[in-house]
Amino acid sequence: MHVLFIIDPLPLLKAYKDSSVAMMQALQARGHTLSVALQGDLYIDAGEVRTRFAPIALRDGADLHGHDWWRETGAADEAPLARFDAVVMRKDPPFDMEYVYSTHLLEYAQQQGARVFNSGAAIRNHPEKLAITEFPDLTTPTLVTRDMGRIRAFHAAQGDVIVKPLDGMGGTGIFRLQRSEPNLNAILETLTDNGTRTIMAQRYIPEIVKGDKRILLIGGEPVPYSLARIPLAGETRGNLAAGGRGVAQPLSERDLHLARTVADRLAGRGLLLVGLDVIGDYITEVNVTSPTCFVEITEQTGFNVPEMFAVALESAAG
């Protein structure tokens, strides 16, 4: 297959721990050809969704801590997305309007015969924090609103809540509001921009001290290990970007129940790769843009997550 990755600039990637790089390694090892494009390389001309792209190969045995781990194998070119055997969307958030426009282009490309993973429409229709509201039985009590009075009432009823923006990533903008929080109003005014920006409030889950878990679903099947992201002492955010420590562990029975309950439904919508964030017994986020943790799970357990992805992509692309 000729696989196109829509991705951030390669020199900016931390290749030694980047899941997209791990995917590329697995695909190249299985004999597939790789190309890369940036989000800004996508365009429509005369109704056809096209892209500028660069064909690349990963260097065998390269030091992934440096910048010399890949090479261009030909001149940059342009082509319709439908010409590739598979298009893998791996552009990191933020999920801003440019990202939304990109999902539209990917959706149009699919209508023209392109095989895109994850599907453009599916990415757009599953905002990572809002998507959990489809599964209320699997989540902690959750409120989505910009009404500060409603949030205060929710806080009073629950006693201990987490509030966060809907478009944040890496743990940014997340606050824990305990019952006696003296800065409640100031925090809500800031997060909601004085009632003009919708946010999410969730009942605090004490098990966060043991870490939140990233459970990966690939082709409708759960990876048998999660990555528990243990917060720093005094932190309520387990995100690796916020200083959390990643520890791989086998899925529990509850983890498997959560994963299997949502896996088929999400896979059937064109979501080849999904990352569930789980705290205790509850799903807290459904990540569909650029799920990670491939490398950490593989290195700590020996289970080859990138290989599982490559096999699933081959099957899905037909």
Swiss-Prot record:
Pathway where this protein functions: Sulfur metabolism; glutathione biosynthesis; glutathione from L-cysteine and L-glutamate: step 2/2
EC number: 6.3.2.3
Cofactor binding annotation: Binds 1 Mg(2+) or Mn(2+) ion per subunit.
GO CC annotation terms, alphabetical: cytoplasm
Gene3D superfamilies membership: 3.40.50.20, ATP-grasp fold, A domain, ATP-grasp fold, B domain
ATP-grasp domain residues: 129-314
Binding sites annotated in the UniProt record for ATP: 155-211
Disulfide pairings: none
Top-level enzyme category: ligase
Pfam families cross-referenced by the UniProt entry: GSH-S_ATP (PF02955), GSH-S_N (PF02951)
SUPFAM superfamilies: Glutathione synthetase ATP-binding domain-like, PreATP-grasp domain
GO molecular function, one term: metal ion binding
Binding locations of Mg(2+): 285, 287
Swiss-Prot/TrEMBL keywords: ATP-binding, Glutathione biosynthesis, Ligase, Magnesium, Manganese, Metal-binding, Nucleotide-binding
Cofactor names: Mg(2+); Mn(2+)
Family listed: Belongs to the prokaryotic GSH synthase family.
Listed HAMAP family: GSH_S
Record-given protein name: Glutathione synthetase
Native species: Bordetella parapertussis (strain 12822 / ATCC BAA-587 / NCTC 13253)
Gene: gshB
